Each structure stands twice: as structure tokens, then as C-alpha cells.
Amino acid sequence: MEKKFSGKIWKFGNDIDTDTIIPGKRGTIPDRNEMKKYAFELLKPEFGSTVQPGDILVAGTNFGCGSSREQAATVLSYNGVRCIIAKSFARIFFRNAFNSGILLLTCDQIQDVCEGGDIVTVDVDAQTVSVNGKTFKVGAVPENLYNIVANGGLIEDTKKRLAAGNVKMDIKPLSMEQCRKKGYTMVEKILKKNAGKEHVAPGDIVITKPDMFMIHDIYTTYLLETMKDIGADKIDDPDKVTIVWDHCMPTAVAKNDYDHYEAGLELAKTYGIKKLHIGEGICHTIMHEAKYAKPGEIATATDSHTTTYGGAGNFCSGIGTAEMAAALITGELWFKVPEAIKIVLNGHLRDGVMSKDVILRILGDIKADGGQYKSLEFTGPAAHEMSMEQRFTVANMALEAGAKCGLFEADEKTAEYYGMPLEDIDWVCVDDRSKV
């Protein structure tokens, strides 16, 4: 991939969500070359028929917000979009786009001096974008992400890794004593423990070995297709994986989405996955009821509301199917350490006031992108009075502020719920000496 290139601009505003990029009714089209024709069909109907390979999108804040729908990044990649320049990106779209081979750059000035049809020049090494005689600085691209784009996306990158012998990093988790070291936010503690790093800071890229992976039935067909494309005949640790049939059940079996049902069974048989839950309930509820997502650990799933498990102090975040496939094969997953917002819930919940009311008020205060790529960390008397189900409810909706995760402190209720000694998890707490 060239480090300097030019392309025609397609200009968009703020809060362009994944439903705008590809409407939900088009998201199940099995042929990506057919699906790509419907990109932006409700906003820019001409896009699908006139976009050219190498074109560049320029947008405002929170581009790619809403659902974790990986198809949004996929259709842009299949349409040949080379780069997206925006003021900010929704966190899951950010990952999905890089994994689809699209270069993302952050810049908050170019939007005011360009229009659709203008030609913009990108210089990766100089960290600049230029249009209409003006040049602006852009954020640096982490080396690991640039390499994914240069290799043609995560699938091709993973193929090359397998061909080279799938060499894994030697990651040794931190001891309990090291986890208790002062001066870190909850998310920093969990990430540094898993990554075996004695120190992490916001913006750092860390390689982790997640403790649990969850796949639900909407994405079983795409995941199976991706695994076959990569050529994987085994996964790193089948015992760390669960498949939940819930989004399409029971109609999937009855009439309309039988392929998703069968694909899940084929995934389980092919890769030795034993933790199967067919029509037993909502995937995010099963994750904590089955004790798959534990305090102080890392869980990830093919769904945006994976943040739910943060109610137990579990670092959890949604990813796309390409990234899930790569992570299942390698056992590894990168994360950018987020900044944190400490939210102190003082007082007590009055009769008739539910945890849903609390998070809705918080969302109203900080708005849809107020937690963009941040860890919302809850503490205070009202937080500790909440039941585990109430905490899961709050954490579930942290996503709606663009948050990377929503974490509650692990306390006596958490220990009782999981049947764990409190002293094993009490380090998952807000540290007043942390930079939050």
C-alpha cells in the first residue's frame, strides 16, 4: 500500500450510523458484491452505482455509530473506499473498518474546506491530508493497524500469519500483588493484568488473550464463511468459546433463517465447541448467568451490547466476525487502552426509580458521543446498592454513549453472585489515585 495517495471525496455529516451506511434489511444479503450496491441508499442513493475504487469519505463526529454491524465496513471496502477521514469514529466501526482494509484518519479541520467531488491527498508518513491548497495534520496510525490495512485486511493478514506458523506472543498475566498496584483505572488494571504489562496508559495498544468469546446466531454464517476462507482447521481454545442461538430463534428453525441455525452447529462440530445454548435466552444474560464473563477478566462477542458484563467488573467489548475469526484462531486480540470517566452515584434509588432511569439520565447528560472510546466506571453508594441485574442493565447501555465499556466495582454482591472469594476480585475497584 502506498504511503501517499489521492482520491475523490464523498462528504458526510455527524453521527452517520451503520444503518445509514447499510440498511438493516440489506444486511443479510449473502453476496457482498450484491450487498454493496445498497450502501448509503437512503442518504446518497447514487453512491452504490457511482463510487470508484480509491474514493475517500470525509465526515464529522461519531462516524459509524449505532449497531456493531460489520457489514457497514464490509460494503465500503467492497465498493473500493480506501480511506475515511473523520473528526471521530464509533469504536466498533473503527475496528471493523481497519479489519476490512480501510485506512481511518482523524482530523477536525478538513471538513470546513472541502466539498464532495474535491480531490484530497493523504500522506501517511507526514501525517497530513491536503485539499484545495490547505494541509492539515491527522492522528498517527498505530503500526499494527497499518500493517493490517497494508496486507489487505485482517483475513489476509491472518492467512499470512498462519502461513508463517502462527507464532504466538508469550503473555504472562500479572500476579494479584501487581494487580493491586495503585494509580490505575479499572479498565487499565484489567488490561494490564491480562496483557502481562506492569504499566499501561490511555492510547497504548496492548495484545491480550481474552478469557471468553461469544458468538450469536446472526453472525454464524459469516463467521463460518470467514473461517473457511482463512483455511483454519482448528481454533486456539474451544473451551473459551460459546455459541448462543437467540437473535433468530425460534423463527430460524421454523422458517426463515435456517442457515444461521445450521451454521452454528457446523461451527461447533468443526472446531470442537461444547458450550452451546440453543433458544435458552438472550446471549448477554447467558454470559453472566453461566458465569462465562467473570470479574477482572476479558470477554468479547459479535455484538455491540457486549458491554453488559461490565456490571460484574468484566472488561467486555464487541467485535466483528472477521476479528472474531482471527481471535479464535490466534487466541489474541488487540485493544487500545481507553481513558476513563468516573461516575459517582450518590444517594439512594427512590421507589419507582430503576437502574434504566439512572443510565438514561447519564446518557442525556453526556450525549450520544460523550463516552466515545472511554471506560465509564461506576462507584458510589447507589452503585453498590444496585443488584447485579441492575448493574448489568446500566453497563449494557454504556454503549449508547459510545463507550468502550461500562465497569462496576467488584464487591460482596459480585463475589456472592459468582461464588468467588472477594479477595480474588476486590482489586477491580476505582482508585482515587488514578488519572480519571
What residue ranges belong to the model's regions?
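Fe-S-dependent hydro-lyases/dehydratases of central metabolism
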Residues: 1-436
